[in-house]
């Protein structure tokens, strides 16, 4: 007896019905996708996020410098002529030619008070301990983890939260603004890189709660004033005003030690070195917005960004990191002196007009605009679980 076979068309129809039935049963078992799972998708362009999260050559260079100082640096001090002060030398071995043996090369030179510092060996041990902490923090960061988690810890660094905060940039747009009283009315006022307020009070105010600087500012203070002024004279807003500093060059950690050693009760030099996680978070946000702006302006692939910016030196500005810190400690944040206008000086307190090439200010302005209008669109801050961007107002 011959078997009866179904026509091919009927076989395909039967398979389609069975497949549809199975898919419906699977959907019933799984349920619809939850809004909570979809909300966990990272904010921003995935490719730009991945590229921005790469620390790049600049971070590797700083780590290499710190490791070299930790392993090979030497410190020696000598009395000056007349023994009025001491000359301090930070040196590293350096081969001046491929065949020549390494010889000591001076990395930093400071004039310091005769009796304010510990012996050379103890000072070197303290410097190596500071370098060791610096390296350990960045290596922990490099092994992964959520750098945005620092946003939950920032209030503890300053000891409390603040209701209203003003971050005062140094742009020349402040001149003639009359914003001084409005700035001083905030609970916390953050100023940048020890910018002068004397003579500009009507436009920039006089109140300062925190001075935020890059370590180049501290290095300049130490080189000029370590011998003559307590705490290197690096607190123009008063000896009690704390300073938050991010490290541009690991050798500058020695300046911090020197200035701490010359502190007095009236100038106690309260210095906070920024958390490595905060440094990484700011670097990623700055690079993301710079990448996005590059792609939008040029139409080129994001991979070509390095043709416009040298990764070894590209860096966020002091102002941007101060803004991110304020987001973590303040219920409301106001930004003054960020931006530019035709004819305005780069800094209100200097004659500088040209911007520094290592910063992408336009990209940072895009970031501030998103903080004010679209805070949920800011990448990487969404990784800070339990953190909400506070209201931000950018005063033009």
UniProtKB/Swiss-Prot annotation:
Membrane-spanning residues where?
Answer: 7-23
What ranges are annotated Cytoplasmic (topological domains)?
A: 1-6
Xref: Gene3D superfamilies = Glycosyl transferase family 29
Q: Provide the Gene Ontology terms for cellular component.
A: Golgi membrane
Residues carrying covalently attached carbohydrate according to the record: 72, 260, 304
The GO terms describing molecular function are: sialyltransferase activity
List where in the cell it is found.
Golgi apparatus membrane
Q: Its membrane topology, per UniProt?
A: Single-pass type II membrane protein
Per its database record, what is this protein's job? Does not possess sialyltransferase-like activity in vitro.
Designated name of the protein = Sialyltransferase-like protein 2
Name the species this protein comes from: Oryza sativa subsp. indica
Q: What is the lineage of its organism?
A: Eukaryota, Viridiplantae, Streptophyta, Embryophyta, Tracheophyta
Supply the gene name.
STLP2
């Amino acid at each position: 007896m011959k078997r009866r076979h179904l026509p091919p068309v009927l076989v395909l129809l039967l398979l389609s019905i069975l497949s549809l039935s199975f898919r419906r049963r699977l959907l019933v078992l799984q349920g619809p996708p939850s809004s909570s799972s979809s909300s966990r998708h990272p904010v921003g362009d995935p490719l730009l996020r991945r590229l921005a999260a790469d620390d790049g050559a600049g971070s590797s260079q700083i780590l290499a410098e710190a490791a070299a100082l930790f392993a090979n640096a030497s410190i020696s001090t000598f009395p000056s002529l007349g023994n009025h002060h001491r000359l301090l030398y930070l040196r590293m071995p350096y081969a001046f030619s491929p065949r020549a043996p390494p010889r000591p090369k001076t990395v930093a030179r400071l004039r310091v008070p005769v009796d304010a510092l510990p012996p050379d060996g103890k000072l070197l041990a303290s410097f190596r301990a500071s370098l060791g902490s610096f390296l350990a923090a960045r290596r922990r960061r490099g092994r992964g983890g959520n750098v945005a988690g620092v946003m939950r810890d920032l209030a503890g660094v300053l000891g409390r939260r603040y209701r209203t905060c003003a971050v005062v940039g140094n742009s020349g747009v402040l001149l003639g603004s009359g914003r001084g009283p409005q700035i001083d009315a905030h609970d916390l006022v953050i100023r940048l890189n020890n910018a002068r307020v004397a003579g500009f009070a009507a436009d920039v105010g006089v109140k300062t709660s925190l001075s935020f600087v890059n370590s180049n500012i501290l290095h300049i203070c130490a080189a000029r004033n370590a011998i003559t002024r307590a705490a290197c004279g690096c607190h123009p807003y008063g000896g009690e005003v704390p300073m938050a500093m991010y490290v541009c060059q690991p050798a500058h950690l020695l300046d911090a030690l020197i200035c701490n050693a010359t502190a007095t009760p009236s100038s106690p030099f309260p210095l906070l070195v920024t958390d490595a996680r905060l440094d990484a978070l700011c670097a990623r946000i700055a690079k993301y917005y710079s990448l996005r702006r590059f792609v939008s302006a040029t139409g080129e692939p994001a991979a070509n960004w390095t043709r416009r910016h040298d990764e070894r030196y590209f860096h966020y500005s002091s102002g941007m990191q101060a803004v991110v810190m304020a987001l973590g400690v303040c219920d409301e944040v106001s930004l003054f002196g960020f931006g530019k206008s035709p004819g305005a000086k780069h800094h209100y307190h200097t004659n500088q007009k040209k911007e520094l090439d290592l910063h992408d200010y336009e990209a940072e302005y895009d970031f501030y605009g998103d903080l004010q209008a679209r805070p949920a669109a800011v990448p990487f801050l969404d990784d800070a679980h339990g953190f909400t961007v506070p209201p931000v107002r950018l005063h033009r």
